[in-house]
Amino acid sequence: MALDALASILETVLRNCGINEISRVTTKFEEALDDCGMKVDDWREAYYKERFPKRMTATTMASQIMNFEIENLQLRNKAWAEGADRKFRLLSSFEIGNKDGHTILVPKTRNAEILLANSTSDLKLSSFPSEAVAKLAEENEKMRKQIEHLREQQTSKSTATLCEALENMTERMKLIEREKETVRRMFLECDKTNQRLRKQIQICEEEATDRLVLVNSHHREEILIMKREIYRLQMENVTLKEQIDSIEQELDHSNRIVRGLANRAGLVVDEVDSGNETSDLSDDSDHDDHENSESDLEDMMDPGEDERIPRGGENPRRQARMLQMREEMERLHEDMEILNLNLDLDI
């Protein structure tokens, strides 16, 4: 019965905790209790049978109490008949004992304890007159007065010392308060200075940031301009190279024509390096070259005494143009180096 109650409680707890296989767990629990020797049902039966008296009705209990009172009266009457009066019955409630070498009465019943407490609550021993005791009492009184006087003196000295120490402490506290106020003012001034410096630093940082943004934007614009200029120079260089190649081709063609005409006329023409010759790109230079070529053809068709002297030579215009092209290429290289240096600085 008790084991079933425990199993039911365990089943409820497992269900509230959301644990599955409740029946198997409760069965294992009952087997474990039985295996370890915990006979819960046997314990419950022994507890209710031996611990508590048998149940009875109010009538039965009243009858037993009445029988107990009657038996008590019978015993008292029997003792009275045998000569046990009040004094005998009172003294029979005490025993004689020994405590620290002194004889004492030991109560055996509750009534005896009450009687002993009532007898000793107001008990006072009578004083035994003696001159020695009176002398000791007088000396004791004198010593008590001296002790009180010393205590008063000690108290007065301590009070004076405490008052002096309190005054010194008060002065020190006032001095500390003044120093504290001074330090507080210094802290306030320092805070104001710090706030002012923070504002100045913030303004400087903003100005530096703005300047840096402007400088960076200016650098970017310069870089874009330099890139455009480099691209323009590169394109111009390509155009110049194409023009030079075209002029060299025309010069070779003209040389072949001149050689052919010279061969027909039976003349000798000196070889000229065509790779180092060029002409001006302007209209005036083209016109002059055309006139020079016509005059050269006329001279070749009508040779004179100096026909074996080579004509042409180094063209001053070509030399000036080549020098100008070299200067432009040098400036282009310098611009490229400056641009690379600015890019490195920005990075």
Swiss-Prot record:
Residues 274-286, 294-305 have a biased composition (Acidic residues). GO terms for cellular component: host cell cytoplasm. One of its GO terms (biological process) is regulation of translation. It is found in: Host cytoplasm. GO terms for molecular function: RNA binding. The keyword Lipoprotein does not apply. Residues 306-317 have a biased composition (Basic and acidic residues). Residues 230-257 form a coiled coil. Residues 274-321 are annotated as: Disordered. May play a role in stimulating the translation of viral mRNAs. Belongs to the rotavirus NSP3 family. This is Non-structural protein 3. It comes from Rotavirus B (isolate RVB/Human/China/ADRV/1982). The lineage of its organism: Viruses, Riboviria, Orthornavirae, Duplornaviricota, Resentoviricetes.
